[in-house]
Curated annotation (Swiss-Prot):
This is Glucosamine-6-phosphate deaminase. GO terms for molecular function: glucosamine-6-phosphate deaminase activity; identical protein binding. Catalyzes the reversible isomerization-deamination of glucosamine 6-phosphate (GlcN6P) to form fructose 6-phosphate (Fru6P) and ammonium ion. Keywords: Carbohydrate metabolism, Hydrolase. It comes from Lactobacillus johnsonii (strain CNCM I-12250 / La1 / NCC 533).
Length: 239
């Protein structure tokens, strides 16, 4: 695991962009993408670059179940706004949150991932160490699955909605095993609220109670965090 400590999230986004650019130069064709505030500086750099993604495939980690893609809180909407409107990909896969049969959609998404092995997976991390909607206790062997959102996640996400009742209770999420099958993983973490999660990710035991801790067992992981998020790390892990 490589740790890169930056002064802020803007520099962190640039470091992640450099990894993607190098990967594309080396022939990478499939990017695993995340939503949330952490990857926005990366997507800004991608949009501002002269890179052409029209021959690339993207696969997103997750989507709320029950939200129309046009809803401004859907992850479809997020990706269009922050990346795809300016930089279209050849194929852009995101779970269908309006699928009539959620189990069929889970199977369909697993097939998509199997047919398009991910070269570089971008991740964020939650305060409790979750990655995507894989909350503490999610089996490390999980593939794409439907998720009942925890009360803490519903409360955390309620700030994006008019009230807590509007927050979806279910999501479709790429599983931890699927994430671990990516050739390279780049995890982004910025701000004081991520200090404990970063420390557990890097230093703690590998346990399903901290889903991100499994990344210690991946052969090619880069953690990019700002100085604040890295504040609790043992100095030996900082470069």
């Amino acid at each position: 695991m490589k740790i890169i400590v930056t002064k802020d999230n803007i520099e962190g986004g640039t470091k992640a962009f450099e990894i993607i650019k190098k990967g594309m130069e080396d022939g990478d064709k499939v990017l695993g993408l995340a939503t949330g505030s952490s990857p926005i500086p990366l997507y800004d750099d991608m949009c501002d670059s002269d890179l052409d993604f029209s021959d690339m495939t993207s696969i997103n980690l997750d989507e709320y179940y029950g939200l129309n893609p046009d809803n401004d809180q859907s992850y479809h909407y997020f990706m269009q706004k922050h990346l795809f409107d300016k930089k279209p990909f050849k194929h852009s896969y995101i779970p269908n949150g309006m699928a009539k049969d959620i189990d069929e959609e889970v199977d369909r998404y697993n097939d998509i991932i199997a047919a398009n092995p991910i070269d570089i997976q971008i991740l964020g991390i939650g305060r409790n160490g979750h990655i995507a909607f894989n909350e503490p206790g999610t089996p490390f062997g999980s593939l794409t699955h439907k998720v009942q959102l925890t009360e803490s996640t519903i409360k955390a996400n309620s700030r994006f909605f008019d009230n807590e009742d509007e927050v979806p209770r279910q999501a479709i999420c790429m599983g931890i095993k699927s994430i671990m099958q990516s050739k390279k993983i780049v995890l982004l973490a910025f701000g004081e609220s991520k200090q404990d999660a970063v420390k557990a990710l890097v230093e703690g035991p590998v346990t399903e109670e901290v889903p991100a801790s499994i990344l210690q067992d991946h052969p090619d992981v880069t953690v990019i965090c700002d100085e604040v998020a890295a504040a609790k790390l043992d100095p030996k892990y900082r470069n």
